[in-house]
Amino acid sequence: MKYLYLHGLGQNADSWNKVTRATEVSGNSACLDLAEMVKGKVATYSALYSAFSEMCNAENEDIILCGLSLGSVLALNYAIDYPKKVKALVLIAAQYKMPARLLKLQNALFHFMPQSMFQQTGFGKLDFISLCSTMAELDFSD
C-alpha cells in the first residue's frame, strides 16, 4: 500500500516532511510536488488533476491519499473517479463544492501581490490565479 501526501496551493512537498518522519510508513510514502506536475503547462485544475490521476493510476498497489486544501480536492476527486484504487482518504480543509465568490476575491488579491510571494511554493503568480479560476466551478456534491 502506498501513502501519497498532497500539499495545498500555498505549500510545497516539503510541507509534509515532519509528518512522514513521524509515521511508520515513510518508506512506502511520497510527498508529491503539485507544481512539478504542471511544469511547462498552463496550470489549470484539469491539467493538474490529469497529471495526478495518471501518476496514481500507474501505481501497482492500493493508495492512501492524504491531502491539504488543494491536495484534498485532488484526493477527493480521484477517490470519486477511482474508488477501488483508494484504500483510505485523509482530507484536511477539503471543499466538496468550491466557494466561487471567495475564489474570485482571492484571485483579485493575488493580482496585487508581488511575484516573490508565490515563488517558494513552486507555482508562479499566474499559476495561482489560473488554478483558482479553473477550480471555481468544481462541485462534488452529487
Name every feature range the model reports, one short phrase each.
Residues 67-71, 75:
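Gly/Ala-rich beta-loop-alpha elbow adjacent to hydrolase catalytic centers
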Residues 10-18:
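Serine-hydrolase catalytic-loop signature spanning alpha/beta hydrolases and amidase-signature enzymes
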Residues 133-142:
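Conserved serine/cysteine hydrolase catalytic core
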Residues 2-8:
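Short beta-strand element of the alpha/beta-hydrolase
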Residues 65-67, 92:
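Short beta-strand immediately N-terminal to the catalytic nucleophile in serine-hydrolase-like folds
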